[in-house]
UniProtKB/Swiss-Prot annotation:
Family: Belongs to the RuvB family.
Enzyme Commission number(s) from the entry: 3.6.4.-
Positions of ATP binding: 8, 49, 52-54, 115-117, 158, 168, 206
Main subcellular localisation: cytoplasm
GO biological process, one term: DNA repair
Record region (Small ATPAse domain (RuvB-S)): 169-234
Name of the featured protein: Holliday junction branch migration complex subunit RuvB
Keyword DNA-binding in record: yes
Organism from which the protein derives: Ureaplasma urealyticum serovar 10 (strain ATCC 33699 / Western)
Entry keywords, A to Z: ATP-binding, Cytoplasm, DNA damage, DNA recombination, DNA repair, DNA-binding, Hydrolase, Nucleotide-binding
Organism phylogeny: Bacteria, Bacillati, Mycoplasmatota, Mycoplasmoidales, Mycoplasmoidaceae
Domain remarks in the Swiss-Prot or TrEMBL record: Has 3 domains, the large (RuvB-L) and small ATPase (RuvB-S) domains and the C-terminal head (RuvB-H) domain. The head domain binds DNA, while the ATPase domains jointly bind ATP, ADP or are empty depending on the state of the subunit in the translocation cycle. During a single DNA translocation step the structure of each domain remains the same, but their relative positions change.
Length: 312
């Protein structure tokens, strides 16, 4: 079975959707190549699965350089930054996913590195220790985050580009599904089936590719009716999944607002997953309301549960 990496486009010409962003990126990349410099440090923020890692890879490929990938929670101390910088060559890309999770000491180390391309290190111990400034190759830091508000302001100010990746249009998702099916599977899918998958993907390419792979699995095993397939894998109207239904049921059982901590305890999920993976779509489509007192299901959310006989 294909992995998510195999679905990722490698160059701008292959990237579907986000036309304005692609147009601007093409201009910035062309200018950078003419100036023979490194691409400006870039911050990508938005929901998970909207193409942040893909764009980082594309920028590196378009520049003809290597892309070194790491996670923010792995960068806690200055030595973590030093070790990462020891791997790069001139104009390489460093991609830090969930960059908001870096430790404070790592953030502070990055500030001078991003501006001056040098790093201060301590050589020796105790009273014999001396600070030495080392130059590092010019490079591009690309940070990705689902929580822009947790990025320290001094770090955010050092990014030359800040791009927001919102949900994709349904037509863009349909085009992604069509292309990936043609390239990787060649399974018979009509327009109606592609539209159903696209409408269930919540505007997220990663989710669209996951649904496509599950549909392919069932089609190969003789299941032709896509609605039956969705029933089997528990995909409901609007693309809601089992964890969405469980979340809505928790709110349905409450007369008043309920707090995030209580929801997490009932569902046995971490608060971060709820805030970043479940709630945004439910809020956007008016299934729930969120305020300072907590979360409450809306009339639309109640109607959805009742119409689909999903009340637990």
């Amino acid at each position: 079975m294909k992995t998510n990496n195999e679905f990722r486009p490698q160059y701008l010409k292959d990237f579907i959707g986000k036309d304005q962003l692609k147009s601007n990126l093409k201009i910035y990349l062309n200018a950078t190549k003419r100036l023979k410099s490194s691409f400006d440090h870039t911050l990508l923020h938005g929901l998970a699965g909207t193409g942040k890692t893909t764009l980082a890879t594309i920028i590196a490929n378009e520049m003809g350089v290597d892309c070194h990938m790491t996670q923010g929670n792995l960068l806690n101390k200055p030595v973590d930054i030093i070790n990462l910088l020891s791997l790069i060559k001139e104009n390489d890309v460093i991609f830090v996913d969930e960059i908001h999770a870096c430790g404070l000491a790592a953030f502070e180390t990055l500030y001078s590195v991003l501006e001056d391309f040098c790093i201060d290190i301590s050589i020796g111990k105790d009273f014999n220790a001396k600070m030495t400034r080392l130059k590092v190759p010019h490079f591009t830091l690309i940070g990705a985050t689902t929580m822009l508000g947790k990025i320290p302001e001094p770090l955010e100010e050092r990014f030359g580009h800040v791009f927001y990746l919102s949900e994709y249009e349904t037509s863009e998702i349909a085009a992604i599904i069509l292309k990936n099916n043609q390239i990787h599977f060649q399974i018979n899918l009509n327009d109606q089936e592609i539209d159903l998958i696209a409408n269930s993907a919540k505007g997220i390419p990663r989710l669209a590719n996951r649904l496509l792979k599950r549909v392919v699995d069932f089609k190969i095993n003789g299941f032709d009716n896509i609605k039956n397939i969705f029933e089997k894998i528990q995909i409901y109207d609007f693309g809601l999944e089992e964890q969405d239904i469980n979340y809505l049921n928790v709110l349905y059982q409450q007369e008043n607002e309920i707090g995030l901590k209580s929801i997490a305890q009932i569902l046995r999920l971490d608060q971060y997953t709820i805030e970043t993976k479940i709630e945004p779509y439910l809020i956007q489509h008016h299934f729930i309301n969120k305020n300072l007192r907590g979360r409450k299901i809306t009339a639309k959310g109640i109607e959805f549960l009742k119409n689909n006989q999903l009340i637990k």
